[in-house]
């Protein structure tokens, strides 16, 4: 009789929709979405699931499709399980087969009409800028070191606040998107300085391809007093994509979480993990370095 790590693979089981909370350090991956060429989170996760439940090829759906080099602290995914593995055993079973840069934090069963992407009411990203004058080896994998100027965070936040609401954000959409429109609703933005770190949080119903990195690139130009708020508003309100040129590096961006009408994972699962002081806490300490 076939078994997988103590699970009877011949035992009849109902279809179960499994939701996972996962984290990954995105530096060495070609983004979330499976590709013909490239090392992607989706492909690795689907292969690991199939190695445990080979009754049907796994199809994993994510709340947000992160680009190459982007990290995730609280990515939410789902897949349908046809095998006998108990829901609570999926994290340990998968973590034994995944690379250390991908970790499964929690698993719960959802109804078959629940969808990690379509059921989400918001996604939240965080971008970290290290505005210190000297390089920091330990911050480099998680931040954009930007120090030609001391950034003016008050101007940056003022510009960002003007984005709140539902708008056409074509100016912040990279080419290659298959979306039929560029409307989305930004629900919240926040930019806070903690010593030499600028922490930019943005929450929206959804994000366009490359949107956050293009937006942060513009905000940094404002913080350096190279771009006025009026010119920034003209660019995005008139959808002048050709004027939005510099994208912030992927390494400073982290998918913090997706939100749903009802909480699905244990409380604070996203916010109790390393590097909590940098990426995953609501209120970083006043002095970090």
Curated annotation (Swiss-Prot):
It comes from Prochlorococcus marinus (strain SARG / CCMP1375 / SS120). CDD domains: PseudoU_synth_EcTruA. It catalyses: uridine(38/39/40) in tRNA = pseudouridine(38/39/40) in tRNA. Formation of pseudouridine at positions 38, 39 and 40 in the anticodon stem and loop of transfer RNAs. InterPro entries: PsdUridine_synth_cat_dom_sf (IPR020103), PsdUridine_synth_TruA (IPR001406), PsdUridine_synth_TruA_a/b_dom (IPR020097), PsdUridine_synth_TruA_C (IPR020095), TruA/RsuA/RluB/E/F_N (IPR020094). Homodimer. One of its GO terms (molecular function) is tRNA pseudouridine(38-40) synthase activity. Transmembrane segments: none annotated. Pfam families: PseudoU_synth_1. This is tRNA pseudouridine synthase A. It is an enzyme of class 5 (isomerase). Substrate binds at residue 125. Belongs to the tRNA pseudouridine synthase TruA family. PANTHER family: PSEUDOURIDYLATE SYNTHASE, TRNA PSEUDOURIDINE SYNTHASE-LIKE 1. Keywords: Isomerase, tRNA processing. The active site is at 67 (nucleophile). GO terms for biological process: tRNA pseudouridine synthesis. Its EC number is 5.4.99.12.
């Amino acid at each position: 009789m076939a078994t997988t790590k103590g699970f009877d693979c011949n035992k009849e089981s109902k279809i179960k929709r499994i939701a996972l909370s996962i984290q990954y350090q995105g530096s060495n991956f070609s983004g979330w979405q499976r590709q013909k060429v490239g090392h992607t989170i989706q492909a690795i996760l689907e292969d690991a699931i199939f190695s445990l439940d080979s009754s049907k090829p796994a199809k994993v759906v994510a709340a947000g499709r992160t680009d190459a080099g982007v990290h995730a602290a609280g990515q939410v995914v789902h897949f349908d399980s046809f095998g006998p593995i108990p829901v609570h055993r999926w994290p340990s079973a998968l973590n034994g087969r995944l690379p250390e840069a991908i970790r499964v934090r929690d698993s719960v069963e959802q109804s078959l009409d629940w969808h990690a992407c379509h059921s989400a009411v918001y996604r939240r990203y965080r971008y970290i800028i290290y505005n210190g004058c000297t390089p920091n080896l330990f911050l480099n994998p998680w931040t954009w070191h930007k120090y030609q100027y001391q950034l003016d965070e008050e101007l940056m936040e003022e510009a960002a606040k003007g984005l709140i609401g539902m708008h056409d954000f074509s100016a912040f959409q990279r080419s290659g998107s298959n979306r039929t429109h560029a409307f989305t609703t930004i629900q919240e933005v926040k930019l806070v300085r903690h010593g030499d770190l600028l922490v930019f949080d943005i929450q929206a119903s959804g994000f366009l391809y490359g949107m956050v990195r293009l937006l942060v690139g513009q905000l940094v130009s404002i913080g350096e007093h190279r771009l006025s708020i009026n010119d920034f508003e003209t660019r995005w309100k008139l959808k002048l994509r050709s004027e939005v040129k510099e994208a912030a590096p992927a390494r400073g961006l982290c998918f913090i979480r997706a939100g749903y009408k009802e909480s699905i994972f244990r409380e604070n699962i996203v916010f109790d993990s390393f590097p909590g002081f940098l990426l995953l806490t609501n209120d970083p300490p006043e002095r970090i370095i």
